[in-house]
């Protein structure tokens, strides 16, 4: 996998992008309102947000920097930071206000670093092991996007 701009994409702390499944309904709605195309029947399948890992039941309000996701068959990921949208997100979503809506909604997802390598497949279960619980992903996202234009 190659990344074009390593200042905002890739690197060890951004090895895995995880996005909450529950936010897909929001994006389907706003894409329909914007008359954005690109996906048949506007289904937005898992992975459409650019994530490698789609999380069910875990979002930015439940994830804290340093939390660990431990998978049953091996592999440990640690939450490192929220995703910050760039101009390419607008193009990927098919309308010009997508990045702005990500900032306003806080539906950003999170980057994860690999703490212990392992194999993870669709449907695998994991357990959340709390980190120090000092900084919530959404709080960090809000702090870093406050006052910036998208």
Protein language model regions, located:
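Compact, aliphatic and Gly/Pro-tolerant "microcore" segments centered on a short helix or tight beta-hairpin
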Residues: 76, 97-98, 110-113, 119
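Loop/turn positions that initiate beta-strands
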Residues: 66, 117, 121-124
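A structural signal for small-residue-enriched, beta-sheet-centric alpha/beta enzyme cores
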Residues: 107-108, 124-126
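Short alpha-helix capping/helix-loop boundary micro-motifs
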Residues: 55-57, 106-116
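Short, electropositive, low-hydrophobicity segments enriched in small/polar residues
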Residues: 70, 113, 122
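Electropositive, beta-rich accessory/interaction domains or terminal extensions
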Residues: 1-89, 97, 130-150
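Short beta-strand-turn/beta-hairpin segments enriched in glycine/proline and small hydrophobics
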Residues: 92-104
């Amino acid at each position: 996998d190659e990344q074009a701009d390593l200042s905002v994409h890739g690197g060890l702390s951004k090895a895995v992008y995880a996005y909450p499944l529950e936010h897909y309904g929001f994006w389907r709605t706003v894409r329909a309102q914007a008359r954005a195309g690109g996906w048949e029947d506007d289904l937005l399948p898992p992975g459409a947000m650019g994530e490698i890992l789609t999380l069910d039941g875990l979002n930015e309000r439940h994830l804290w920097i340093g939390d660990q996701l431990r998978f049953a068959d091996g592999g440990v990921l640690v939450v490192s930071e929220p995703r910050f949208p760039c101009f390419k997100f607008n193009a990927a979503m098919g309308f010009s206000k997508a990045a702005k809506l990500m900032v306003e909604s806080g539906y950003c997802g999170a980057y994860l670093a690999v703490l212990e390598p392992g194999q993870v497949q669709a449907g695998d279960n994991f357990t959340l092991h709390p980190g120090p619980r000092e900084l919530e992903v959404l709080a960090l996202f809000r702090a870093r996007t406050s006052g910036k234009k998208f």
